[in-house]
Amino acid sequence: MTKQTLTQLEQHDLFLRRHIGPDSSQQQEMLNYVGAESLDDLTAQIVPESIRLSQELSIGDSCGEAEGIAYIRGLAKQNQVFKSYIGMGYYGTQVPNVILRNVLENPGWYTAYTPYQPEIAQGRLEAILNFQQVSMDLTGLDLASASLLDEATAAAEAMALAKRVSKAKKANIFFVADDVFPQTLDVVKTRAECFGFEVVVGPASEAVNHELFGALFQYSNRFGQITDFTDLFAELRAKNVIVTVAADIMSLVLLKSPGSMGADVVFGSAQRFGVPMGFGGPHAAFFVARDEHKRSMPGRIIGVSKDTRGNRALRMAMQTREQHIRREKANSNICTAQILLANMASFYAVFHGPQGLKTIASRINRFADILAAGLQAKGVSLVNNTWFDTISIKGLDVAAVNARALAAEMNLRFDADGIVGVSLDETTIRTDIDALFEVILGAGHGLDVAALDAQIVAQGSQSIPASLVREDAILSHPTFNRYQSETEMMRYIKRLESKDLALNYSMISLGSCTMKLNAAVEMIPVSWPEFANMHPFCPLDQAKGYTQLIEELSSWLVNVTGYDAVCIQPNSGAQGEYAGLLAIRKYHESRGEAHRNICLIPQSAHGTNPASAQLAGMQVVVTACDKQGNVDLEDLKAKAAEVAENLSCIMITYPSTHGVYEETVREICNIVHQHGGQVYLDGANMNAQVGLTSPGFIGADVSHLNLHKTFAIPHGGGGPGMGPIGVKAHLAPFVAGHVVVKPGRESDNNGAVSAAPYGSAGILPISWMYIKLLGSKGLKKSTQTALLNANYVMKKLSEHYPVLFRGRNDRVAHECIIDLRPIKEASGVTEMDIAKRLNDYGFHAPTMSFPVAGTLMIEPTESESKVELDRFIDAMVSIRAEIAKVEAGEWPADNNPLHNAPHTMADIMDSAFDSRPYSREVAVFPSAAVRTNKFWPTVNRIDDVYGDRNLFCACVPLSDYE
């Protein structure tokens, strides 16, 4: 009979023990090795006493998985999922189950990282390339990005691109047609204010009356009207105006492409291609432009290159445009995008194929025709006389219609001017039209859907003018015409998945990325219809479950960060930075100090920081770091004093980007505050703070939190992410608001930074579950274990590689940096060689050349077991032995396992391999662990230079299949 208590048998800490990799005996063994008695002792050795919290978090106790699921199920049931006809960029969709199960709910897809290591990411790179092809085909333009965050932020990016490339250099006006979605205009205005642009809003036809650098039009507009802009666009382009268009992706299946009308840039949401509404996100935006604007495109772009064997290989193209390289001169601060959702949308297009998409789009349009015909037959007046899916109605008794709609559990769109809008979608069926007739007309309307349909078939539909009917073929590439059976689709998805290395195969030790476990129990609620199928603009009393979840999560984040308020809206870390800096900017303006526009940034900062500062209209001044990588206090004091009159803020990361807790962080905060500035603390490394210290306690004023790092939202192969910001009380009135949804906060009337009021709300249940299951003690122990794992790896590797930075007591924080520059000097072996060789050992490489060129930054999260850590350490030790053979001349510098890595099946089958000075076994089975669980890269090292010099960013030509 066991002597355990009932409390012990209930195992409330079971999730904690499953989330943390090393078990108690392994932890003790590791503690003994690093020279600490306990996790608390190790914490005391690492974290400066001056910033250590004296009290535990007040989140509550941990709970079991079943208990957590039951609680969040209760929240979900509080949501009332009405049939939505609101539209405005968010629509019901049918997620094909083959995609739901094999992509959205598959860790092989959702736990991968951004494909910086393309040799082990060919699967999702192909899926993203398909997304780009879909985007180009439907818009009629030349080059597409891999995705942006949402339609509204894509509009802001389009405005910025227009200013960069327009030949109307003296113009400072961006025109926005007055019939765009209101949330799009909201986000554009917010961004324009930072850039100093003037936004003029008016009827589309009036655009030619202004001196513009760019203009934005909606196709179809928010009332559903479809307009042929060909002549207007020609007139604008003749005046050097960059024409941008927000377009509906489903409508483009049937409509003439904006590119063929003369648009320069076309963007929109891909949500209705098989991605749930999710109360606002996450969704991928598409962004497509003319080839001449390619160097000014925001976001990532996938291109076709070749590997060392001359085979086709995919990679991220033109990376020199991005923020991590160009910093404040970058086109955008975009880092995380929406790759998982872009992949879902691309698979949706592949699964349905061009004919299937035409059938879906035609069905939606037919239902809109039937609805319009029935209403007009009863004397109802329509605002629009053309449409794809949206009917706008005037002259109704709005209160009566709304009452009947709510009674029928449906949401219509009610504009302030009395117009009632109805947007139909893929989920619409015949009985929905009957129900809409009853809601709009009242009972006894006498209309018959079948009869109306027969009438339309006989007379022909006039809803899409003949001049606007698409005549060119779409999606003619074989990929979109092969996989319409579920068997073939399932195998295609699996074939791509098998080319990629994700967390479900091995540890991904990327520094500054926190690739921790995304537990299955955390992911389960995401696809529940109560969370997945809610429209972000539905009445808030229908979203009580979401509201409570967001309030609880926000209160927990307030507790964790030491701030006073949280804004959930930013839908990426980069957006969080932008939102936080905007709050600082607005705060200074409220005090009559709008001239404060200088942002101090240490030279070691991530490139997103200066890019975000530039986006917020600030001027960047770089401060020096000392030889230990710390902020140089004397230089900071001098710079702060020099720019004191105009100092807006400083952006710092903590622990610092070089992986240590700087002892002087409070002094840094004090220096900036003394000169009238605010402190922005980048939350990228929050995984080393939770439960031990906090930004608010340290002295910062605002931070963003990467929920896709610290709080367990998966990286999705390059998104989604969430970047909510925490702020001190004095900044709370200046966080983002929203033009459509106003929950009654002081910040309601502020400009938005994202399309939806709560950002990518659909993935918030993941972080809610993570915090709920771990509780106060579990969160702290997770942080402490992350420190233990990092110091264990650091000490083991320090016997073979120099460790570049260490903090107090010779410790690191949650990551360590090994210096490969001496190795490169002695042997010619580069950090790239080591990164690619790790692929042969079954590992994704650590972060390369950040924050110091010629280094690797390693972050082993708390979720990795000692067994996996040792396997990684053994691989690095083995690689060091291989380097020694190059140093000794045993292997030539240009023909060795590192230089030739990664190795593929094709390599070892090639008879020419015999000429290499190492064996096939050394090439592909360099360790015993690999023999039992081999990951095979499918391409050799990719030629980056060739890919950029021969830019090709679409599916390979048909001739490649002949």
Curated annotation (Swiss-Prot):
A molecular function GO annotation: glycine binding
Reactions that this protein is recorded to catalyse: N(6)-[(R)-lipoyl]-L-lysyl-[glycine-cleavage complex H protein] + glycine + H(+) = N(6)-[(R)-S(8)-aminomethyldihydrolipoyl]-L-lysyl-[glycine-cleavage complex H protein] + CO2
Database matches in CDD domains: GDC-P (cd00613)
Keyword Oxidoreductase attributed: yes
Enzymatic class: oxidoreductase
Keyword terms: Oxidoreductase, Pyridoxal phosphate
Record's function text: The glycine cleavage system catalyzes the degradation of glycine. The P protein binds the alpha-amino group of glycine through its pyridoxal phosphate cofactor; CO(2) is released and the remaining methylamine moiety is then transferred to the lipoamide cofactor of the H protein.
Similarity-based family: Belongs to the GcvP family.
Known partners and oligomeric status: The glycine cleavage system is composed of four proteins: P, T, L and H.
Protein name as catalogued: Glycine dehydrogenase (decarboxylating)
